[in-house]
A protein has these predicted regions:
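Sec-dependent bacterial lipoprotein signal peptides
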Residues: 1-22
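Short, compositionally biased serine/threonine- and acidic-rich segments at solvent-exposed termini, linkers
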Residues: 20-64
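C-terminal tail/sorting-segment detector
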Residues: 25-37, 145-166
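Surface-exposed, proline-anchored Ser/Thr-rich loop/turn motifs
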Residues: 55-86
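Short solvent-exposed strand-capping/beta-turn motif centered on an Asx-Ser/Thr pair
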Residues: 88-93
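Extended low-complexity, serine/threonine- and proline-enriched intrinsically disordered segments
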Residues: 94-110, 150
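Surface-exposed loop/edge segments in extracytoplasmic proteins
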Residues: 106-115, 157
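Short, surface-exposed loop/turn motifs with a glycine/proline- and acidic-biased composition
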Residues: 118-153
């Protein structure tokens, strides 16, 4: 009895295995994202990193090599300042738009910014108000460590990171 495996069958098995591995990596990434914020990447107003939190602003497995996220700056940020996020599309058609979301203390999600440009090309710099990170827009509600998420418009998580509002 001959054992015969065709090249298309072997390639199909390899693609299926790679797909499962990537899906597992994305699922693990998203599980990390939904844990409570702990620590943050400290940055200057010029986006220089002072201390790096290895968990902050990683690019998800689905977007690695396609999107680069510059950590939020300045971080920490005062309630009377604004802070920036930079999202760089490394290739044309990497993503078709995105949204920036914060999880409020009552677990509601609040959209801070939406970008509908399709496709996103180059670097997009977003200016955000830390008062929007609180439940009622007050300085008291905004203070503390807040987690921000970045999703594409298809609902796939691109990145997440923590902001300290002082």
């Amino acid at each position: 009895m001959k054992k015969f495996f065709s090249i298309p069958v072997i390639l199909g098995i390899l693609l299926l295995t790679a797909s499962c591995t990537r899906n597992n990596a994305q699922r693990d990434f998203e599980q990390d994202a939904y844990t409570a914020p702990a620590g943050y990447t400290e940055t200057t107003a010029q986006a220089e990193i002072i201390s790096l939190d290895e968990d902050d602003w990683r690019t998800s497995p689905l977007f690695q090599g396609l999107i680069n996220i510059v950590p939020a700056y300045p971080n920490p940020v005062a309630t009377n300042q604004q802070f920036y996020l930079e999202i760089e599309s490394l290739f044309n058609n990497s993503i078709n738009g995105f949204e920036v979301i914060v999880r409020l203390p009552n677990n509601d999600l609040y959209t801070l910014y939406q970008e509908f440009d399709t496709p996103l090309t180059g670097v997009k710099t977003i200016l955000l108000d830390p008062l929007e990170l609180g439940i009622d827009g007050s300085p008291e509600a905004a203070r503390g460590l807040k987690r921000i998420y970045i999703f594409d418009l298809d609902g796939q998580m691109i990145s997440y990171g923590d902001i300290m509002v002082e």
